């Protein structure tokens, strides 16, 4: 059977839901398409994405196909060190390419087609030059990745070099500060051929050792497995660094090595280079392999080795854990050539009791003096926004408490006490003060925007009454805040993107409504003038008359819940015709009921169904409760998963009760669905409740003993709480499952913990125990689905399943 032409579908007898009692165990079924009402919404041309220069003078419009083709997914692929790459072209095999580019001035609506683009363009890695007069990008041919550049003024593209780039470890180039040259990763001249050991006889056993150290790692996919994998990994990771001028001339800048990171200092005079080192690992991916970081001058001459990181196979337990040694090493945005980095003071172990968890250092070029300690954090370091010599913003956080603290500190005077700015629950969205606005400095790096001794905050503005985004000014000395602007829309959403001119009050915003595609505008917050920048049209006209509202309801323990309810176009709410209901959800963990009860649902959000959405079925006569809140709460010393199943069922019951109370549904005809952890949720709901007629579970994990060192937000391992893992595992409780389920999985799932084997074994258990189930394996797909053929067939499968479950 050729998997690129047919589907592998397994099903047991499911006569109980109206399907023939003589269902065959395996079908070879050609690809199908969903009904026209769904197809018209799924197969639409997308509006372009927008990239603007920093001055908001020029706009780059980037166009992509709505789907990949199965042929694109059928490319050569090599899986090494957690990477999936095409060994022929030397770029990630999962890239979602751009196929066309246009330029336009922000001040007018005239679009210029970029001329000279390659035929059948496969564009990615778009990067503006520092002076924003050029845009570099890569184009992938049938056997290589090429470097191209666009002249913005003329909208003309040209290929810069015939060299084959190495994009296996992300973007293969960066701009020099002069905007005339690029530092480019090129395949080595004498690169050896990759080894194909598929037909070789083994030369010995594969042996791994445990030295007694605790090493609790997640179930990573695509790891190295043998010596040949190691050789091939070194091969695909190795590059020469070339200096390429925009006139097309090129010279070798640094000999071949496994370069994994390159960045120029803000003044453009130094380069920080990181290389992967040996030994490699068979149990962790490339981001935990050893590495070495050096700083060089502009000729590539080494100045200083600034960091060496050993292989990190062993890590303390917990989401606030980290490794020992220097980490988060970056150039300071506010200095010409200074590095900053963080060191754990607790060995990276959250279980240790210490006064301070992390220490932040600054190290000035040429790195011949000792680094300077700037500040210590009581919790785990999160991030820094550099400002000027006397002001920077630092945030630390702690997962177990969900606490997050933000401070102002003086990077020039470590003795000066940091000032607490915010002390908050990171999950309390109603009290979120917003993000500090940044602006470009003299080095063209983004730093804290400071005007008249004020910093500025841009917030999403979620509240009990709705969503009203805002801009606040904060006095740096007193921390007193003044609201400069707050959106008043009740029929639209105005998301604030950036402050463009502090003196004039010009702000870039994006406005959308249920039926209006998100478009960019300039808003003047002083005179309230609004000027449109883009005019993208709604490609989902088939949904314009579908009823959409946010409903709020209460779980039996008092927790407030919400979801977005869609009803078919023309549905008469007064007649209360009983519709089948579809619920789509994804569980989320919380440490308190107040945070769990907060809602980010907004009825004014543009209705744009993804391939995975249930919203399509509003056109097929179903009521749809989308993104229904499914909080799992563990207060105090109780972990959320200690009561996972009861809360899951309570969430579902509350959702059904709420829609039923409106009079719209037949509660005997309700289906539930979810993807990934939502699929796990679905299987548990069908196992432990009788609320649903059927369910759809996509790309889930069903046996938690196969993820023994934690999953999702669970930090404890299986041996600490075997009863929790067992209770939460649908596979372990498959004998209780009697409700029809459609199981879908990508054949090549690359997500930790959701290997395709999870669905295959769960289906075998259900089939063996006589449960009604159907399994669909989508060829070539990973955790998210991409190929048009597979996605349209998925929609057909779901429609067939729901029609048989809920309408017959």
Predicted features by range, described:
Residues 534-577:
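N-terminal cap/lid segment of alpha/beta-hydrolase-fold proteins
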Residues 576-588:
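Short beta-strand element of the alpha/beta-hydrolase
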Residues 293, 339, 421, 520, ...:
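Conserved hydrophobic/aromatic pocket- or pore-lining residues that grip, position, or stack substrates
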Residues 1-9:
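Bacterial N-terminal signal peptides that target proteins for export
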Residues 10-14, 18, 24-518, 522-529, ...:
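Beta-propeller folds
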Residues 92, 97-102, 106, 588, ...:
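Active-site-proximal cap/loop segments of hydrolase catalytic domains
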């Amino acid at each position: 059977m050729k998997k690129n032409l047919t589907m592998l579908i397994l099903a047991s007898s499911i006569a109980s839901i109206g399907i023939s009692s003589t269902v065959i165990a395996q079908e070879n079924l050609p690809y199908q398409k969903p009904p026209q009402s769904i197809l018209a919404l799924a197969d639409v041309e997308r509006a372009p994405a927008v990239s603007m220069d920093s001055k908001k003078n020029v706009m780059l419009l980037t166009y992509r196909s709505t789907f990949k083709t199965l042929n694109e997914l059928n490319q050569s692929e090599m899986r090494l060190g957690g990477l999936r790459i095409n060994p022929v072209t030397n770029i990630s095999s999962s890239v979602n390419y751009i196929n066309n580019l246009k330029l336009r001035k922000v001040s007018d609506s005239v679009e210029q087609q970029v001329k000279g683009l390659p035929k059948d363009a496969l564009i990615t890695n778009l990067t503006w030059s520092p002076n924003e007069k050029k845009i570099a990008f890569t184009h992938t041919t049938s056997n290589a990745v090429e470097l191209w550049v666009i002249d913005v003024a003329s909208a003309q593209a040209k290929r810069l070099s015939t060299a084959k780039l190495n994009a296996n470890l992300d973007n293969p180039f960066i701009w020099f500060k002069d905007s005339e040259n690029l530092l480019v990763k090129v395949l080595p001249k004498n690169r050896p051929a990759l080894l194909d050991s598929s037909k070789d006889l083994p030369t010995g056993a594969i042996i791994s050792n445990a030295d007694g150290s605790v090493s609790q790692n997640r179930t990573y996919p695509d790891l190295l497995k043998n010596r040949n994998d190691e050789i091939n990994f070194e091969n695909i990771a190795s590059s020469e660094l070339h200096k390429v001028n925009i006139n097309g001339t090129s010279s070798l800048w640094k000999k071949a090595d496994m370069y994994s990171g390159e960045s120029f200092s803000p003044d453009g005079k130094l380069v920080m280079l990181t290389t992967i080192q040996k030994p490699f690992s068979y149990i962790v991916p490339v981001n935990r392999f050893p590495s070495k970081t050096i700083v060089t001058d502009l000729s590539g001459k080494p100045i200083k080795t600034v960091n060496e990181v050993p292989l990190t196979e062993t890590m303390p337990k917990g989401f606030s854990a980290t490794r020992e040694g220097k980490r988060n090493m970056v150039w300071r945005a506010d200095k010409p050539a200074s590095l900053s980095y963080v060191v754990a003071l607790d060995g990276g172990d959250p279980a240790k009791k210490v006064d301070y968890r992390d220490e932040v250092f600054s190290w000035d070029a040429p790195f011949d003096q000792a680094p300077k300690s700037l500040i210590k954090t009581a919790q785990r370091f999160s991030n820094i926004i550099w400002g000027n010599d006397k002001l920077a913003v630092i945030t630390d956080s702690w997962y177990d408490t969900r606490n997050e603290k933000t401070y102002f500190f003086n990077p020039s005077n470590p003795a000066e006490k940091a000032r607490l700015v915010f002390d908050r629950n990171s999950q309390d969205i109603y009290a979120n003060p917003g993000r500090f606005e940044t602006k470009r400095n003299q080095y063209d790096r983004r730093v804290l925007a400071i005007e008249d001794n004020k910093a500025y905050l841009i917030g999403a503005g979620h509240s009990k009454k709705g969503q009203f985004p805002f801009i606040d000014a904060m006095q740096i000395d007193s921390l007193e805040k003044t609201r400069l602007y707050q959106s008043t829309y009740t029929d639209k959403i105005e998301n604030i993107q950036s402050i463009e001119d502090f003196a004039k009050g010009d702000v870039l915003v994006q406005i959308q409504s249920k039926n209006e595609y998100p478009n960019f505008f300039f808003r003047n917050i002083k005179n309230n003038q609004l000027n449109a920048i883009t005019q993208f049209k709604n490609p989902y006209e088939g949904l314009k008359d579908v009823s959409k509202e946010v409903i709020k309801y209460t779980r039996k323990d008092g927790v407030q819940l919400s979801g977005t309810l869609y009803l078919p176009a023309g549905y008469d709410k007064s007649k209360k015709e009983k519709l089948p209901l579809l619920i789509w959800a994804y569980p989320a963990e919380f440490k308190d009921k107040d945070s769990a009860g907060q809602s980010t649902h907004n009825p004014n959000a543009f209705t744009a169904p993804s391939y995975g959405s249930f919203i399509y079925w509003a056109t097929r006569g179903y009521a749809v409760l989308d993104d229904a809140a499914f909080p799992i709460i563990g207060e105090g010393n109780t972990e959320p998963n200690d009561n996972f199943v009861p809360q899951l069922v309570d969430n579902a019951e509350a959702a059904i009760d709420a829609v039923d109370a409106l009079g719209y549904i037949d509660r005997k005809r309700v289906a539930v669905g979810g993807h990934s952890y939502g699929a796990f949720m679905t299987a548990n709901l069908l196992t432990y409740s009788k609320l649903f007629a059927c369910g759809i579970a996509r790309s889930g994990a069903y046996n938690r003993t196969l993820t023994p060192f934690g999953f999702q937000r669970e930090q404890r391992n299986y041996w600490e709480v075997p009863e929790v893992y067992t209770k939460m595992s649908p596979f372990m409780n498959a004998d209780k499952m009697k409700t029809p389920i459609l199981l879908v999985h990508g054949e090549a799932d690359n997500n930790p913990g959701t290997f395709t084997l999870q669905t295959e074994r769960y289906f075998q258990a259900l089939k063996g125990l006589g449960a009604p189930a159907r399994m669909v394996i989508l060829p070539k797909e990973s955790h998210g689905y991409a190929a048009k053929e597979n996605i349209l067939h998925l929609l057909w499968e779901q429609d067939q399943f729901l029609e048989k479950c809920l309408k017959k």
